[in-house]
From Swiss-Prot:
Keywords: NAD, Oxidoreductase. This is Alcohol dehydrogenase. NAD(+) binds at residues 12-35. It comes from Drosophila yakuba. Changing residue 233 to R: In strain: Gif-sur-Yvette stock 115.
Length: 256
């Protein structure tokens, strides 16, 4: 079902990163009511730029580390709900690409995403009288087919795809729909700085960047298109400036 972002309230976790900031710029052009950015490090210049793009949109920043205990996330969301009354869309975008940091990669890329999602269900779940909502989780094409030199990162992104697909199937129960946007190799600082697991390929970043990539802006534009298409359960591939829905192959069925 197509979705208009006009006059909506969007919470964007990691909305000041490479792809995140470009996506935030595209979002404010859609005449949101509120864009609430949750990120580890405040960037006043970026916030000012977002406000200047469209002064009609209220842009707010809260410091947030996705690795905090879930109770802290719930407390922060309670503050935001008290301020806005409603949240229409949650974008989970926190991510690191550093297979030297195994525990942190899992904590940021997967556990933090699960905890943030779980926390907002306290407010959205229709079984608790909530209004429902929309969750957009940022995965990666490595969630489909791993970059085998970064198996920890790739594994977390595969987990994001499966978790989100499960959320989508639970929508009739919770009232919360979900989908993933999965960028291909995009020219950001994240790609330039990452390390391979156990240094199995010291030049993994250079080798990846030798192949065709996409600019962050092209990825961001398709990101917002995916939000507007609003297809529950969709697995979007955002690669080389294109937007494509992936058809996931079923190899097993739980039968329940």
């Amino acid at each position: 079902m197509a979705f208009t972002l006009t006059n909506k309230n969007v919470v964007f976790v990691a909305g000041l990163g490479g792809i995140g900031l470009d996506t935030s710029k595209e979002l404010v052009k859609r005449d949101l009511k509120n864009l609430v950015i949750l990120d580890r490090i405040e960037n006043p210049a970026a916030i000012a730029e977002l406000k200047a793009i469209n002064p009609k949109v209220t842009v707010t920043f809260y410091p947030y580390d996705v690795t905090v205990p879930i109770a802290e996330t719930t407390k922060l969301l309670k503050t935001i709900f008290a301020q806005l009354k409603t949240i229409d869309v949650l974008i989970n975008g926190a991510g690191i690409l550093d297979d030297h940091q195994i525990e942190r990669t899992i904590a940021v890329n997967y556990t933090g995403l699960v905890n943030t999602t779980t926390a907002i269900l306290d407010f959205w779940d229709k079984r608790k009288g909530g209004p429902g909502g929309i969750i957009c989780n940022i995965g990666s094409v490595t969630g489909f087919n791993a970059i085998y030199q970064v198996p920890v990162y790739s594994g977390t992104k595969a987990a994001v795809v499966n978790f989100t697909s499960s959320l989508a199937k639970l929508a009739p129960i919770t009232g919360v729909t979900a989908y993933t946007v999965n960028p291909g190799i995009t020219r950001t600082t994240l790609v330039h700085k990452f390390n391979s697991w156990l240094d199995v390929e010291p030049q993994v970043a250079e080798k990846l960047l030798a192949h065709p990539t996409q600019p962050s802006l092209a990825c961001a534009q398709n990101f917002v298109k995916a939000i507007e298409l609003n297809q529950n359960g969709a697995i979007w591939k955002l690669d080389l400036g294109t937007l494509e829905a992936i058809q996931w192959s079923k190899h097993w069925d739980s039968g329940i």
